[in-house]
């Protein structure tokens, strides 16, 4: 089993290029299966989750090639509607393949999704919405059997919660459904707008993708297209946290400042100076961070749940007491126990975490429970005295491309070991 060893207390400085957004690339790759032609997707990150999506695409009949950060998907010969459990279990968001298969073949048979175990993440919103659009869905033994013998049709759908995954599945299904679909209380994350941009480049008619009320006029067929995935705002915030805990001076290139606006106030309250350029963000951290007021995770444009763990690691060495409230997922404090093994003083009760900043952390052997927990441990390891070994590093590989190489380029002492 591979591990990562970090020797802490090295100040990070310099420039780092941001990868493409995992949370954009995955639904776009899935949507490519509904295109009767070739999709060329640029800035597609090299991640194990992306590899899992490519395996699924190939299994259902797509020809997929990767050259650097560009993935080409030829979905002309898509023919299989059944995705085996072992492929579905490799990524949590694999349920996003449900709507492309229904739209393209009129049927789909998939297992419940895999990936990070960070709570229930129910898919009932996905299923109830697709049923409204004409899908017949049965569940048995963890397998979803879906049919739409009369095709999918437009519908007015109101989500009880602005679920990103449900919004994506509805959006893909609606883009080729008969008639108009309106999604109310839709997710507003930048990744939703990016998926809509890809679908529009394929011929879809979509408006309001960043507004919470999305209108989609279905088209009969998608054509070949080319698209560039947006930068990963979550990894941007992770680099910011890494710079902050080391008193660093880091410029993050190839980013979009408007997408990280929700996290900037937290870093500024902690004493960092943050300057946003046209396509970069510069963070200059103080010698000692300050505690911040209550941080609440919320749907976009609120503070992102995916940034919570790394920022908590940052606040664990801030002067004073900070409070975090996790409003999106239950069971998303699985990194707390491991941070405490490094010397952090964190107490949790339900959704609330109270972080009492300590002078320093001390290196130890810790284990990543999920992707974001792993990034938090990496951030903490950079701040810790001595050596920190992170086990289960394969979970970090699901979302952070070239972590060691990128951090090493900024001055970190970090190595992967077998």
Residue ranges and their predicted role:
Residues 1-418:
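Short, structured segments at the rim of ligand-binding sites
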């Amino acid at each position: 089993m591979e591990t990562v060893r970090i020797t802490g207390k090295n100040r990070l400085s310099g420039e780092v290029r941001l990868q493409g957004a995992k949370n954009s690339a995955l639904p776009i790759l899935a949507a490519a299966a509904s295109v009767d032609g070739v999709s060329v997707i640029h800035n597609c990150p090299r991640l194990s989750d992306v590899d899992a999506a490519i395996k699924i695409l190939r299994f259902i009949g797509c020809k997929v090639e990767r050259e650097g950060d560009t993935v080409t998907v030829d979905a002309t010969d898509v023919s299989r509607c059944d995705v085996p459990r072992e492929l579905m279990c490799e990524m949590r968001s694999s349920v996003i393949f449900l709507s492309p298969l229904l739209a393209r073949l009129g049927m789909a048979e998939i297992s419940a999704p895999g990936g990070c175990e960070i709570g229930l993440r129910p898919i009932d919103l996905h299923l109830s919405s697709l049923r409204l659009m004409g899908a017949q869905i049965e569940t048995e033994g963890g397998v979803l059997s879906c049919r739409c013998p009369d095709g999918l049709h437009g519908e007015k759908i109101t989500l009880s919660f602005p679920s990103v995954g449900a919004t994506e599945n509805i959006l893909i299904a609606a883009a080729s459904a008969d008639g108009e679909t309106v999604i109310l209380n839709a997710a507003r994350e930048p990744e939703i707008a990016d998926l809509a941009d890809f679908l529009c480049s394929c011929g879809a008619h979509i408006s309001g993708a960043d507004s919470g009320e999305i209108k989609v006029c279905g088209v009969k067929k998608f054509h070949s297209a080319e698209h560039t995935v947006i930068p990963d705002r979550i990894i941007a915030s992770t680099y910011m946290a890494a710079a902050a805990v080391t008193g660093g001076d880091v410029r993050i290139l190839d980013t979009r400042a408007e997408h990280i606006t929700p996290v900037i106030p937290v870093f500024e309250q902690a004493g960092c100076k943050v300057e946003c350029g046209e396509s970069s963000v510069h963070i200059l951290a103080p010698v000692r961070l300050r505690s911040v007021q209550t941080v609440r995770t919320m749907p976009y444009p609120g503070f992102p749940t995916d940034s919570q763990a790394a920022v908590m690691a940052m606040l664990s060495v801030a002067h004073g007491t900070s409070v975090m409230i996790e409003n999106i997922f239950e069971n998303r404090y699985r990194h707390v126990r491991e941070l405490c093994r490094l010397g952090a003083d964190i107490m949790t009760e339900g959704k609330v975490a109270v972080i009492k900043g300590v002078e320093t952390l001390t290196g130890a052997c810790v284990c990543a429970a999920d992707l974001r927990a792993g990034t938090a441990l990496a951030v903490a390891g950079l701040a810790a005295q001595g050596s920190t070994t992170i086990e289960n590093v394969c979970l970090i590989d699901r979302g952070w491309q070239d972590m060691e190489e990128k951090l090493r380029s900024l001055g970190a002492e970090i190595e992967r070991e077998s």
